[in-house]
Amino acid sequence: ITYIPTQQGWAYLSTIMDRYTKKVIAWDLGKRMTVELVQRTLNKAIKSQDYPEAVILHSDQGSQYTSLEYEELLKYYGMTHSFSRRGYPYHNASLESWHGHLKREWVYQFKYKNFEEAYQSIFWYIEAFYNSKRIH
């Protein structure tokens, strides 16, 4: 999860990326950093992809990802959960790097008035530019 600044407070971006293709498989923007936010993102990923049998989903050890609810959802989908070592973001470097690129290339160019404006802008960046035009 990464923080997106708006004039009304933070928005929280949850992202699932394919580490092989570097494409964003699913994302969601929330007004709160909750288990429900990361569950919605995972459900979007499942609906958008034909995924192989042996899927490993890697995340940090944030409370959203270590919650019983999230672990049960992963188990329901038959996924293996892999964690970064606590306080060691390098294990999740590809996603951390992508969040940095998103912010430098796009988010910091704007001053979002509200959540909806941030959502529309990030939607355009991911769906119309990053996944379809930007070289990975």
Q: What residue ranges belong to the model's regions?
A:
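Charged DNA-binding/catalytic regions of mobile-element recombinases
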Residues: 1-136
